[in-house]
Amino acid sequence: MGGSRELMRILGLDYGSKTVGVAVSDMLGMTAQRLEIIRRPKENHLRRTFRRIEELAKEYEIESIVLDYPLNMDDSVGDRAEKTLAFKRELEERLNVPVFLVDERLTTVEADEIMAECGIPRSDFGLYVDMIAAEIILQDYLNNMTNTASKVSL
């Protein structure tokens, strides 16, 4: 198999008001696997959230992070997107790794569809949605990286 792809791991995050869904790529940067949901009691209580992300980044030897960017449907930047930008800046400062923003519109809808197909009761969707959304966001990013690399190598 030709081509030399660097071994790297990327963390995918779905940042919400009280949770952060977490996914991680395999070492080849080809597939995303969901990891966990980091929960916090209040929106601005982020100390434990950052500490846990730092632990995961160290454990998985993360080289970059992909973070959801919740633009409005008309492409405008709303309150959630502003909070995500502040979260991004703090991540970059604390972890010293690049953080890439990915348009995450409709990932929750896609996550709901996946859970329904898996037979998860709708009443339990809240237990998994952020983690699955993080996996979708990261997988979309990885797919785009692979497609770009394929086009360049042709």
Cite the ranges covered by each PLM segment:
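Phosphate- and other anionic-substrate recognition elements at nucleic-acid/protein interfaces
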Residues: G2-L11, K18-L154
